[in-house]
Amino acid sequence: MPNLSCYTMQVPIQHMYKLSHEGSGLLYAWFLSMHTRVDIILYSKKTEGELLFVVNYIYDALCRLEKMANFYNPASELAYVNRTAFVSPVVLSEELYSMIDLCLEYNGKTLGCFDITVHSENYNQNTIQSVHLSAEDHSIYFSRPGVAVNLSGFLKGYALETIKSILNECVIENALINMGNSSVLALGNHPVGTGWKVNNILLHN
């Protein structure tokens, strides 16, 4: 990772920054990624420029994941796989191979409930058996036509794990990441409390 330094915010990202009396800074940033709004709160003694760098680091990582694994982007690596893996095996990038391999593992662990082939033509519960990975050369092959892999049900959770790694690398101990109110990562503490209050639980008779 490059040194943390003053970093100019990219155009798609908006942010606000406030410095506390104790010398810690609160940065709130938001942008659109993966067809949803991403809200980021960072609380740290790092400078505003250093925190902006972290946000841009996260933004770039999400852009990379979208370019690789977005089912709906015809230019993505995954879209190329869906177009050509029945014709001949396709060698995958290391990360996409690992993602699909993990999803196949989850399919087995959930007894088929988690299935990345549900958008295939003439889909049935055995469609996923037509997806074949080769550990030898990290290639993928579809043994029947019409098979399509869609990682949309996996990608946001994977993205949060990627963001967590970035925050650890940048030594950010207090953070809240919200991707469309459906995928949330909370680390450390809120500026004025312990932990992060995500929502109230309302009980009704």
Annotated model-derived regions:
Residues M1-N205:
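Mature catalytic core of soluble alpha/beta enzymes
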